[in-house]
Amino acid sequence: MFLLDANVLLAAHRGDHPNHRTVRPWFDRLLAADDPFTVPNLVWASFLRLATNRRIFEIPSPRAEAFAFVEAVTAQPHHLPTNPGPRHLMLLRKLCDEADASGDLIPDAVLAAIAVGHHCAVVSLDRDFARFASVRHIRPPL
């Protein structure tokens, strides 16, 4: 199963994102397929924070448009909701130790721990996931 990161969702959603032209076709194929994928709620929160932020986008996504994207993706029959499981803190500690993670790498470690807990591969444009040796990281074709 794939766990999608906020940067992949932003690239798929925003036509002005530098990676939109390559990520969107990959994303459309994911939605058209039957393979399960997940987006944890904390990733959706990050997506909404970034997509609607005037400091990031000259013309941010209207909140209603950003929520419509969230609702369209989560309505897919092969989208499976996931959130931190009962072993999350133990996995987070292990991954932080493995990658010597602190500061800005902690949110990536949180996603990595969710991915490990649910046997997912992380799909992200962020190369920092390569620092977690026990996490399978996939970059969409660019």
Swiss-Prot record:
Pfam families: PIN. Mg(2+) binds at residues 5, 108. One of its GO terms (biological process) is negative regulation of growth. Induction: Induced in persister cells in response to D-cycloserine. Keywords: Hydrolase, Magnesium, Metal-binding, Nuclease, Toxin-antitoxin system. Residues 3-139 form the PINc domain. Its cofactor is Mg(2+). Its EC number is 3.1.-.-. GO terms for molecular function: magnesium ion binding; RNA nuclease activity. InterPro entries: Mtu_PIN (IPR006226), PIN-like_dom_sf (IPR029060), PIN_dom (IPR002716), VapC_family (IPR022907). Gene3D superfamilies: 5'-nuclease (3.40.50.1010). HAMAP family: VapC_Nob1 (MF_00265). Belongs to the PINc/VapC protein family. Toxic component of a type II toxin-antitoxin (TA) system. An RNase. Upon expression in M.smegmatis inhibits colony formation. Its toxic effect is neutralized by coexpression with cognate antitoxin VapB31. This is Ribonuclease VapC31. It comes from Mycobacterium tuberculosis (strain ATCC 25618 / H37Rv).
